[in-house]
Amino acid sequence: MKLQIYNPNGEEFQYDFKSDIPFSFHIKNLYENLVVHNNGLKKILQSFPYCEANRSYDEIYSHYSLQEATSGNWMSNSTDSTFIKGSPDNTLFFKLKPLTHYLTPIEKLIGTTTSSSSSSSSPSSSSSSSSSSSSSSPSSPSLIGLILSLQTHLALLMYENIYGNKNNSKDTNNSGTINNNNNNNNNSGGSNIKLSSTPSSSFLTFPTSTSNLLLSSDVIKKILNIVFLAPSPQSLQLLVFLVSNSPSNDDLLSQISNTHSNSQLHGFSIGGGGGGSGNNSSITSIGGGDSKKIENKDNSGSAVVGSQSNSPQSSSFVKSQQIQQQQQYQKPNNSSPPPTTTTTTTTTTTTSGSQVKLSVGGNSGSFNNTTESSPSLFTLVDTAIKSVSTEHSSNFYLHILNNPAYNEVIETHFEMVCLILSLINNMYRLSPNPINYFNRLHNDSILKYIMEFAKKNQKIYQNTQYIVLRNYLMKELHMQRLHPINVDKVLSHQILLSDLWGSALSSYPFGGINSEHWLLLGFRSSNPMEDFKNTGVLALRNLSYFSKQHLQPFQSLLLTQTKREKDDNDNNNNKVIDKPIITNKFNIETLDDDNDNNNNQELNNNNNNNNNNNYNIKTKPRSNSRSYPLATVAISLTYTLSNIFRIGRINDSPIDSSIWDIAFSGSNWFDEIFVTTFNLFESLWHSEAHSYSDFPQVISHTREIIEKVCSKSPINLQDFKDKLTTLLEKKDEISSLDVNTVETLARYHQLQPSHINKRHIHKFFGERVNVDKLPNSNNPTDNIITTNTNTTTTTTTSTNNDCESTILQDHIESDKNNDDNNNNNEIIDDCESNSSFLVSSNTKEFSGKNLIKFFGEKTDQKEQYSTQPSNVKSYKLKNFFGDQPVVINKNGGGGGGGGGGGVDNELNQGGETVNKNKNDLIDDSDDENDNDEVNNNNNSNRINQDINHKLYGNSPISERNHRLHVFFGEWFDTEQVEYNEKIRSSSSTPDTSSPPLNSQPESARLHKLNKFFGERVNIPISKPKVIGEGGGGGIFPIDDIDVTDGSTNNHHIGGGGGGGSSDNLLSRSPEETRSDFKAQKVLGERLDIKKEKESINFASQPSNVREYKLHKLFGEMVPAHKQKSPKLQGGSGPWKKGNVSKSDSQAVVAPLNTIKFNNGNTNMNPLLQSCPTPINSPTSLSSDHLLDDVLDLNQTNNNIDNENDDINEAIIPPSLSPTLLGVNNHGEEEEEEEEEEEGYNHTQDNHAQDNHAQDNLLLLDDDDDTKSEPIPSTNTLLDSDIIPNNTTTTTTTTTTTTTTTTNTTGQKRISILSTDTNRPGSSNYGESSLSNGSRFDGIPESTTHNANGDDDHQINLHSSSPQPLPKFVNTDDEDNNNNNNNKKQDDDEDDEDDDDKEEIRKKRENKTNHRLHVFFGERFDVENIHFFTRVSSSPGSYDAHLNNPHLSVSPQPETVRSYKLKKFFGKNPEDNVTLSSSYDSSTSPLLSQLNHHHHHNHHQSASNLINNINNNNNNNNNNNSNNNSNNQNNLNSSNNSNNSSISNNSGKNNTNNNNNNNTNNNNDNSPSTSPSSSFKKHQYQYVSAEDPEGDVSKTNEIRKLRRDFKTQRILGERLNIKKESTVVAFQDQPSTIKVDKLISLFGEKVGFSLKRKESQRDLQHQASSSNLKFSLASSSK
């Protein structure tokens, strides 16, 4: 049977159809005939890349079938009715099957797999779908086969419709064919695509002569749904093939300019970047400036699916297109618009003679010759992707990239990513607005995922699709860099320009491109287009982005330039002649504004064509100005960045292209880098530039730093910033670049946006802060920019009024009695200090829990605060809320010495006078504010609060600042122990104040303690000028310091008697001179130290807060709010409490000016030198210790022979202390034992020793010439030189030591050493026995050999008294020594060897030192630690006739004195009662016995005591000669009266009553002998026979009592303190706490004796109890 058949070539022929032959054989035969007669189809099939892998070339025929022309039915077998009828008029079409025959079985199979149901149905018309019923998974072979068949069929349809008709030269006019209006060659030059619309969907129709392809939105959505539900490389290739082989506008231009050849067919590779254009080979140079490669790369327009023209175009049209695009890229400075926004229309004539208009590069991107508008393939695909993503609630791209089925297989995952890259590249090529498309990909984090994948798999960097996508991301920047601004024709350029105007010049109406107001932004002329000439649209884009997205920092920079210019005008009132700026590729150069017009003033003037760059600049900064034109600098930075990132240049090197990887991080990455670079420039300018002429240097440094950062290939913006910060912090050195990175980094962090929130503040401070009042560091609204129309310059308006109202409201809420009108000064100061946001809504919220949070203890299981390190600097929190200003003591006297001068003279006189020196900072109207903070019933506290309010105001800001200083201290510097700035106390009167006795002034400790405990103190800070001192290195500019006087001689520490009137400078301590960049990194602002004019203000904290602070520091609860009652029964000395015994009623101090000295012939040894011990040194013997072992010379003047009238006139010593130091029966042994356990070091304070060296010389008198020779100090003696004496008699109530020395002729001399026993360095400690032939042996002596070979014992006297001491006096009167021979015979005691006790004491001391090591966490030199103490006396106890003004020193607060070091040495607070009772004399027979002798000794008068000593020695010589045979230890063998000399072996001494009546009163257990710990280890302890091991048992008891506490302290267990005011338990301090932590609080290493709580007294009573009359009166009772 003959059938009329039409093939896809348009050929009509008759075919003999036989029904006995299978239908498939007929189809195959027709297909082979089609291929034979169509050479073009043969070539297509040969180059076709998507042939089914498991099928032969001939099996493609299965995609073809026959369709009846009249009914449109498809034939399926040979028995069809059409063949049976055999009508010759029946026409059949041999063509491809429809897509629905392949889509339906795949959809059913996917639905069966996802729903776990079976499906065996398949279309009967598709022979390739018969195997789909057995599929069980999306990746099964049956599904893959169906997808490959669909892909092959789709490829055949597209190729056939595009290229199948190229060789057909016939006209087909058969009426039976499908009607097609565009089927003749006359219209072949136009598009063969038309839009067919139906009520249900839109279709993309390929209306060729044999086309049956209908690509509707439903078909595209079905394909995307298949890819989404069955993601695999095969299914994804189907989608990529669909979009990659649709020609874009550029592809059609390329096809028009070339004939249909094999090169066109090879363009249809996977992700080739466009059909037939060879994009793979040329896309990498997009924007590179190569005219040969980029002529076809203007892909900004959209593409409509269509077919290529059948006829070649004329060569003239091709040349015109190439020349036009080459001019657009190579000549960006001309007036031609960019191809992305303009339309170029060219008329050309095709071979048929018809004219076609080609629209190139327009926004619509259309390419047609019809009036119909057809949707692009991009629109259909993108809409379908959005629909599928919405339907499945998952992003289409991310779903495929994160498919877990393929992520585990590396190769498959890599292939999927590459296919997605190809899809994105083709979608970008087809997109009518590729910028918006990329922005959506950035917002969906798709490109970010690709960047993260590239980190894991480095192979993708070499992938072609990755390189293409990276170039596409950079294409926009290339275009904007090369295209000039055309505001008249390009709307986007107008928008950018208007945004810049609206952000910076919003107060002016938009003036267009020609306005004088552009000069205010820093443009070089009124037409900014001239400035953008070399950077194109890119610089305008960067400026517009900066001003719009970073509005506040942008306005802040503008305001900064205005302020700099204003400061320059204030400093230079001369008229400045404006001179033009000459630029050469933005290496901006300036001309000096001096009268010198030489050409050498031009910097780097290499531009030969700069005539057009010279403008009449009206607002150009002077060459000596520190301001710069912002817009000009921005343009220069854009040019610099474009060169660094090679924007607008050819970039063929892969190494250079790697810098573009940062483009995956975000859509505005280049703009953000521009902002960061501008901040860097501002930071460098701030630290380096001194004038505008420094611009080339600053811009060079900026470029070098950015290049250094870019060389590290940052992958995103944050990585770029981190690398830049690391570079500025010098963690990575900058080669050949000397930059002040400290100031630069500080300014850089200040310009960065602040990310501080409530969580950060709570973490630091543990309390709520009104974050709404936190000012943004970049907030320009604090200084609103206004303009003056007369001068057209910007000005600023202060917001002090708003700040006043804000702070004033807080003042009203905190204190209703406050007068609103009298607080303006304080409010303004608060605004100027930039700390108004510190106001807390309720300052009472601060509690111990907050303190625990600060110190790192875990108080809430949900909140954990990190422990603060011990080396935290003061700026960490101080700068967090702004530096706290200090008071400049403008009128205070600068002289040292004396107390109460300068600041102190006017303060606290009756508690009512305010320091006049502070009135410079206080308005007179503030005198009415006497009723502020009326919350304290105590009158003295009330007065202090009124004073502080007048000085500081009652703003909660002061309380906040107090807390900050409480935590860290003003000079918390662990690297520097010796402070260069000191504070003088203003809380004490001149009578009770004293100058510093060592490197640390006394008031510093009190100041720091008050600061620590939250008490209000009004202490002005008077500091010398310090610039660049200490660890800071002088990092701040000198102009930041308020220097009013260049002389530093007038700036002394504290007020003195000098009364100088010169102003003190506001300067900084070594800690304060350190960099503030860490604080600025947090806050993002630079602190203004010039405006710090307020004094430190301390808030009264609740008592429990103070207890918490003490407990946190010392590991135990301290009842800070309770002062201990005084112990009235015991007198008090300046160093120990309860020193005076009641039995000292007969103790009378004899004035030493009545003592006469004999002029004896004595050869003085030059070693007898006084090397005075500093008063504050622990080595200096405390007065109560020393007085235990010296003679009471109360009535010595009555017993000394008056015949010695020829003596040298003695030097009159100062009057004695008003306090007579006695012995407390109950407290001394406890204090002594505790001092031993605390391991006090006994080394000299050499620094303080030198300060008093001139006052502490012991003057010696000789017969021939009077000469002052100092006696060596005890610290020059070895331990072996210190020999305890057991044959001398000692009392504890005298202040004069009588010493006898023996010269070579056997003559003796008694030397009276007068020492102020109330001084800390008193040296009256030795035992003495005076007689004929004996000498005073109470002082360690050094043995020398005289000329006769005899041993001469020279006494080494130790004195630290600053007053001159009397000379030695020799007396030979023996009659006066016989009066009281038998007074002390009943007081003898048995003497025992105490070596075991000495070992026990040494072991105890070693353990104490070990505990110090454990506590402080390091092996520091315990022997060199200086512990200092203070004495106190009441103001009323000061005696004017006493010449020693240093006796009254303010003590430590009582709570700290008792509890400060308990944790250091293992004392358990809850066992204090037991510890105290263990030393009670009623429970210790030994102590009772020793106390008995002690009281007995005190009943003797000084006169009787001396006579007793003399008579006793005479009896020893005359009556007890038999016993003297055992006392041959005397080193002077020429004298028979030697048995009272010092012996090293006390166990061999005679034990008779006469020789032992006064022995060993210096026993460690005796309360009467609490000598300095310097000599404890050389004295012997005696144990009573009744209790031979009493002392050992007490020691063991003490150790047992503190055992548990030590364990808790070391292990950090929770303490169970019974007497806590709250139930909160604390952990101990870690063992790594350094000793400097205490130094930072108290200013020095301070030692305390641990006393019983019963003996603790308040400061007032302790001060009054030190009065001499009070002590004598109490003791007489």
UniProtKB/Swiss-Prot annotation:
- Biased composition of type Polar residues is found at 1306-1334, 1445-1454
| Biased composition annotated in UniProt, kind: Acidic residues | 922-933, 1228-1238, 1387-1397
**GO terms for biological process?**
actin filament organization; actin filament polymerization; cell motility; chemotaxis to cAMP; response to differentiation-inducing factor 1
Q: Which domain of life is it from?
A: Eukaryota
- What GO cellular component term, any one, is given? cell leading edge
User: What keywords are annotated for this sequence in UniProt?
Assistant: Coiled coil
The residue ranges of the ELMO domain are 492-710
Which spans of this chain does the record mark as coiled coil?
Answer: 1186-1212
Where is composition skewed (Low complexity) in this entry? 115-139, 172-194, 307-334, 341-352, 597-616, 934-946, 985-996, 1285-1305, 1475-1488, 1503-1574, 1663-1677
- Fetch the InterPro entries from UniProt: ELMO_dom, ELMO_domain-containing
Quick one: where's region Disordered? Answer: 112-139, 168-194, 264-372, 592-625, 775-801, 888-947, 982-1002, 1047-1075, 1122-1141, 1197-1248, 1261-1404, 1434-1454, 1467-1593, 1654-1677
> Under the GO molecular function aspect, what terms does this record hold?
G-protein beta-subunit binding; small GTPase binding
Whether Ribonucleoprotein counts among this entry's keywords is no
Keyword Coiled coil carried by entry: yes
Composition skew (Gly residues), residue ranges:
269-278, 891-903
Xref: PANTHER family: ELMO DOMAIN-CONTAINING PROTEIN E, ENGULFMENT AND CELL MOTILITY
Q: What is this protein called?
A: ELMO domain-containing protein E
Q: Which organism is it from?
A: Dictyostelium discoideum
Gene name linked to the record: elmoE
